[in-house]
Amino acid sequence: MKLTCVVIVAALLLTACQLITALDCGGTQKHRALRSTIKLSLLRQHRGWCGDPGATCGKLRLYCCSGFCDCYTKTCKDKSSA
């Protein structure tokens, strides 16, 4: 009987600790994948990894030097044609 009570109390304490930890996070893990794609895009921009007109672009792909990626064809467009 005592062992059962100890196990129940331990389970309740662990559950409470998990809930407290989840509340303390303050949503820092929300949209983690989205943030990582944005970081990757920014990293590629700053390191000069950009594509010329006609190159494939989009999420997790090459960033366009012109800054214009056609969302339908997933290709870089020239500033004058955008």
From Swiss-Prot:
Q: Name one GO molecular function term.
A: ion channel inhibitor activity
Marked site: Functionally important residue, that binds to the site 8 of the channel = K59, R61, Y63
Q: Which residues bind a protein?
A: C71
Question: Could you tell me where this protein is found in the cell?
Answer: Secreted
Q: How is it modified after translation?
A: Cys-71 is a key residue that tethers to the channel by covalent attachment, leading to nearly irreversible inhibition (k(off) very low). In order to determine the solution structure without dimerization, this residue was mutated to Cys.
Q: Which domain of life is it from?
A: Eukaryota
Give residue ranges for the propeptide.
Answer: 23-47
Outcome, altering K74 to G/F: No change in affinity to Nav1.2/SCN2A
Q: Which cysteines are joined by disulfide bonds?
A: C50-C65, C57-C69, C64-C76
List 4-hydroxyproline occurrences by residue.
P53
A Pfam family of this chain: Conotoxin
Sorted alphabetically, which keywords does the UniProt record give? Bromination, Disulfide bond, Hydroxylation, Ion channel impairing toxin, Knottin, Neurotoxin, Secreted, Signal, Toxin, Voltage-gated sodium channel impairing toxin
Q: Quick one: signal sequence residues? A: 1-22
Q: Which GO terms describe its cellular component?
A: extracellular region
- PTM sites of type 6'-bromotryptophan: W49
- Additional note from the record: Negative results: shows a very low affinity to Nav1.5/SCN5A (Kd=207 uM) and does not show activity on rNav1.8/SCN10A.
Q: Which family, according to the similarity comment? A: Belongs to the conotoxin O1 superfamily.
About its domains, the entry says: The presence of a 'disulfide through disulfide knot' structurally defines this protein as a knottin. The cysteine framework is VI/VII (C-C-CC-C-C).
Q: What is this protein called?
A: Mu-conotoxin GVIIJ
Query: Could you read off the lineage of the organism from its UniProt record?
Result: Eukaryota, Metazoa, Spiralia, Lophotrochozoa, Mollusca
